[in-house]
Amino acid sequence: MQNRNKGITLVALIITIVVMLILVAVSVNVIIKSNLIGTAEKTVNKYKTASEEEANGGVIEIDGKKYNSIEDYMAGKEKLPDIKAGERATANSNYKGAVIPKGFTVSGISTEQDVDNGLVIYDIPEGTTPDWSNPDSVKTKYNQFVWIPVEVKSSDTEDSIASFYRSEWTTNASTGGERTTGLSTDYTEPDSTNDTVDKTGIADQITELTKSIYKYGGFYIGRYEAGSTKERTSSSLQTEPFVVQQDKYPYNYVKWGKSMSDVSEGAVYLSNNLYASTNTNYGATSMLCTGASWDSMLDFIKDSSHSVTDGTTWGNYGDSETYTINRGKYAVYNTSNNTLENFQDVVNEYPKEKGKSILLTTGATERNCSKNIYDVAGNCWEWTTESVSS
């Protein structure tokens, strides 16, 4: 994830489905405040009816909501309405087992519709008709996110998911790397592993993220590095909104926060505000990528052609073999004076030579992509919620 200029880009952000969790919490409060005996009697009758429905191989229905099983009902995992490719979700919906948050559209591009190969959703305004036959016209205009499946076992809980963890990696050429449970204790998620007051809100966000993954079986991550419509400099504001779109300047020269306890600007602030919890137009909220989310994403995209322990064969590094860039812009890093030159348009194609360091606009080449996620290897360093201290 290296970038030779002095900036650091935002990590691809996480979309967590938390709206339904809030609604469930409200329902629980209502039940607690009502007649407990009457509620218990009604629950028994509902459970009996649901058991009969499940035994008959059908979807069960309780209080007007549908569930695939009684276990799903107990876990609050409501059956979501199905949605088609190219369709915009007016409520949290299901597409091939992935949750499509309210306000987002399933890609209408055939190579972006498979969960195992990177399902893509777009933030396309209501009433807009995208031209799916011209992919670049859509990729450069709307924010995009990719679904990262996470295995949830019956032994997991909403507070702890065995397959969702921060990890180290060992080399394995045939698989692209092996994920291990070992991890340096130098890195922590701020205020989530000690007794200090959580001044950033990240500990609570991680709690909600884990609950969401337990309920829905995954999360979304930005398809591209955070982008800017204009070149950034060391004097650029730390509160300017970013986008997650193709052919944008990397959102570099950005701090993690004002300090480790003040996130009123910088990467954490920007990520939180892309899809804030107060925005009821969406069935999702955003946050800066956590360490566990980053490693889960790596586990999803790795294969024999995309190593997560040596990205020189598919990433943008100075020592990467020569490869071709066929869209967007590039800026050459001048090693003689340690400066980044101005961005230049790619005309037809540009050969990135081994030994030359360059910075690319987002999604500049398919070579640097795995499962529809771009520029994970090289181009820029990425921020996560991890830190070396609290």
Regions found by a protein language model. Name each.
Residues 6-28:
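N-terminal single-pass transmembrane signal-anchor helix
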Residues 28, 151-155, 224-228, 293, ...:
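Acidic glycine-/aspartate-rich tracts in secreted/extracellular proteins
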Residues 30-53:
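Aliphatic-rich helix starts adjacent to a transmembrane/signal segment
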Residues 51-68:
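Short extracytoplasmic
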Residues 69-149, 153-158, 286:
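GGW-centered surface loops in extracellular recognition modules
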Residues 135-142, 173-376:
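Short aromatic-cysteine micro-motif
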Residues 154-163, 228-234:
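Short, solvent-exposed loop/turn elements at domain surfaces
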Residues 381-382:
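Generic structural signal for well-ordered beta-strand positions
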